[in-house]
Amino acid sequence: MKRAYVNVWFLIGGLCILCSTIFAQQSAPRVVVRAGHLLDTKSGKTLVNQAIVIEGGKIVSVGPIAEVKTAAGDQIIELPQATVLPGLIDAHTHLDEGPENHGYPGLAVSVPRHALIGARNARATLEAGFTTIRNVGADGFSDVALRDAINAGEIPGPRMLVSGPALSITGGHCDNNLLPFEYHATGDGVADGIAAVQHKVRENIKYGADLIKVCATGGVLSQGDDPQASQYTLEEMRAIVADAHRLGRRVCIRRRE
């Protein structure tokens, strides 16, 4: 049973990569995927022997294999042993991070390296069946570069909504708190006071952010802050949200219970 489950996920990943390739090639022929099983998330049922028709990079119809007619030139993909389901969504990711990024070793990881780590993780995420993700916090806008490369068809990966650097108070969860004073190290998203947080929101949007990420409390992996303590004031938070909404962006808040 375990082996069959793993095989299903590999097939799902393969189908995701196929769809990603189709998106980049709008002139591709019509694709008909014949699946042994299809998870219908609306009804909560698993349907058998279903055909998925893809035209111009979009799914245009789904129905029983016996009822879907094919034509000369169609690309037929036979997956009789596979279970196909809609692409999964992960609303909290950091694709530009890995084991090499955490703690003091992470201080040696450059922004270009962050982007390359992101390319590796983007492919793995797509192959795991996730076709849309929200990346909430990345140094140097490496997530923006990754999103743009995926959208341009240069590398495989899911659709990405990205925040750029997360906003933080000085010494907060998303500041750089590992180095001593003489290095004057500061996180990319640090901003204190109403005028400063408004500027940071606008700066993130200027450089390509789809949303704004805010570290509203301390965290368990940052040094010197309390995970239970509020960091931004209510007035600062209101200023962040108001400016982001005025500019057509949503705000994602990171907080501990």
Locations of the language-model features?
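N-terminal secretory signal peptides that target proteins for export/translocation
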Residues: 1-7
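Bacterial N-terminal signal peptides
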Residues: 8-21
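Boundary at the C-terminal end of the N-terminal hydrophobic targeting segment
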Residues: 22-26
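Divalent metal-coordination and catalytic microenvironments
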Residues: 36, 52, 57, 81, ...
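Histidine-rich, glycine-flanked metal-binding segment
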Residues: 38, 44-85
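Metal-associated gating/positioning segment near the N- to mid-region
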Residues: 82-154, 170-173, 177-180, 235, ...
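Histidine/acidic residue-rich metal-binding segments in metalloenzymes
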Residues: 145, 196-257
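Surface-exposed loop and adjacent secondary-structure segments within mature catalytic domains
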Residues: 159-162, 166-179, 206
